[in-house]
């Protein structure tokens, strides 16, 4: 029989059954009752597994050492989880932690940071708790029924020509391609222009190697991307010119085209913005992905170029249907959309097929 008693602002629950005596403290009476009922059912069915008496902080440490280190996005996840380990939530025992604790954490974080940041941290926490279930420490993810913060509207900020010119000027990159880039600052300017021409992510640009560039076909192959899939990106005339300019500083010791890590690219770009007085202009390097390609390329083709798996994100955030003059572009592409089809016909999309809900359905193999 469970005993639930209020002690100050908290609720103390105790279960004694079949020789097992367990207790825990909760923020709400409802959470205390739920825990007690779940424990009693487990004891009655013989499925009871004792939850180890470790704190969330200790659990985070185990997860970082065994799981995070195996991920491609380990740096970002490590930063988020270490930040969580410094919150009051981290000191709570796994035997006691419940939805109310996570709700209190969520509400407090929303006072400190943006909903987007909270969503990312919540995602890392949820992955941590899911792994905890796999380790047989708990049987249910306490975040499962916790309401997510409402995501903000997609970013639509785009660079204007004046901002592009200012950033290139302060980088010292020679757009006339006479003087080769000599510093990381110069290379950052080149990477910025290359991003505008290709819609590639900063990490993809930083990891781009010479052996994956085909000058004859005017393409570059990305063996691994953010979503875990490879893709081939067509290169515009300007993108090819930038790459040809960078061949003058190509070295045998470093196969990377821009010779810097993603962190260096991010740091140097922030430095350029500060030098030019644009640090408060609400501009991110990632905003280059909605620049010229969004103006010139059909949304279906753009999805294949940019690597987006979700067409709704692409259309809401990046796509600008300003294509009245056709698809023969200054960038060097000749991309004519399939006649008779539109985004309204869209039904399903992945890296292999586009299926349209016409009658009869049309399947296009990519």
From Swiss-Prot:
Question: Residues in domain Core-binding (CB)?
Answer: 54-133
Task: For this entry, list what GO says about its biological process.
Answer: chromosome segregation; DNA recombination; establishment of integrated proviral latency; symbiont entry into host cell; viral genome integration into host DNA
**Single GO MF annotation:** site-specific recombinase activity
Alphabetical list of PROSITE patterns matching this protein: CB, TYR_RECOMBINASE
Keyword line: DNA integration, DNA recombination, DNA-binding, Viral genome integration, Virus entry into host cell
Query: Residue limits of the Tyr recombinase domain?
Result: 168-331
As given in the record, the signal peptide range reads none
Any matching Pfam family:
Phage_integrase
Q: Which InterPro entries match?
A: CB, DNA_brk_join_enz, Integrase-like_cat_sf, Integrase_catalytic, Integrase_recombinase_N, Tyrosine_recombinase_XerCD
UniProt-recorded name of the protein: Putative integrase/recombinase HI_1572
Q: Which SUPFAM superfamilies match?
A: DNA breaking-rejoining enzymes
Q: Can you tell me which family this protein belongs to? A: Belongs to the 'phage' integrase family.
Q: Which residues form the active site?
A: 201, 226, 308, 318
């Amino acid at each position: 029989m469970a005993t639930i008693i209020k002690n100050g602002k908290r609720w103390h629950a105790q279960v004694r059954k079949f020789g097992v005596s367990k207790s825990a403290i909760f923020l709400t009476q409802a959470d205390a009752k739920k825990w007690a009922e779940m424990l009693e059912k487990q004891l009655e069915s013989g499925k009871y597994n004792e939850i180890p008496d470790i704190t969330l902080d200790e659990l985070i440490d185990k997860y970082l050492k065994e799981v995070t280190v195996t991920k491609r996005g380990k740096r970002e996840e490590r930063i988020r989880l270490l930040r969580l380990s410094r919150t009051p939530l981290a000191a709570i025992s796994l035997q006691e932690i419940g939805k109310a604790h996570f709700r209190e954490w969520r509400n407090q974080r929303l006072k400190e940071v943006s909903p987007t940041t909270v969503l990312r941290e919540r995602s890392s926490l949820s992955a941590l708790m899911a792994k905890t279930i796999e380790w047989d420490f708990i049987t249910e993810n306490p975040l499962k029924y916790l309401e997510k913060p409402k995501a903000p509207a997609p970013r639509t900020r785009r660079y204007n020509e004046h901002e592009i010119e200012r950033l290139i000027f302060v980088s010292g990159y020679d757009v006339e391609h006479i003087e080769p880039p000599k510093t990381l600052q110069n290379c950052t300017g080149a990477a910025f222009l290359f991003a505008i021409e290709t819609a590639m992510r900063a990490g993809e640009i930083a990891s781009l190697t010479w052996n994956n560039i085909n000058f004859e076909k005017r393409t570059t192959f990305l063996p691994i991307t953010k979503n875990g899939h490879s893709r081939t990106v067509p290169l515009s005339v300007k993108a090819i010119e930038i790459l040809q300019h960078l061949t003058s500083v190509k070295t045998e010791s470093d196969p990377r085209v821009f010779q810097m890590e993603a962190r260096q690219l991010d740091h140097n770009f922030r430095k350029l913005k500060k030098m030019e007085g644009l640090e408060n202009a609400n501009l991110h390097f990632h905003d280059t992905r909605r620049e010229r390609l969004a103006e010139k390329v059909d949304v279906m083709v753009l999805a294949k170029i940019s690597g987006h798996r979700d067409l709704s994100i692409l259309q809401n955030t990046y796509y600008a249907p300003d294509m009245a003059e056709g698809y023969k572009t200054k960038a060097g592409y000749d991309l004519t959309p399939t006649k008779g089809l539109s985004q309204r016909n869209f039904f399903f999309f992945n890296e292999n097929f586009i299926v349209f809900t016409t009658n009869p359905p049309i399947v296009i193999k990519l």
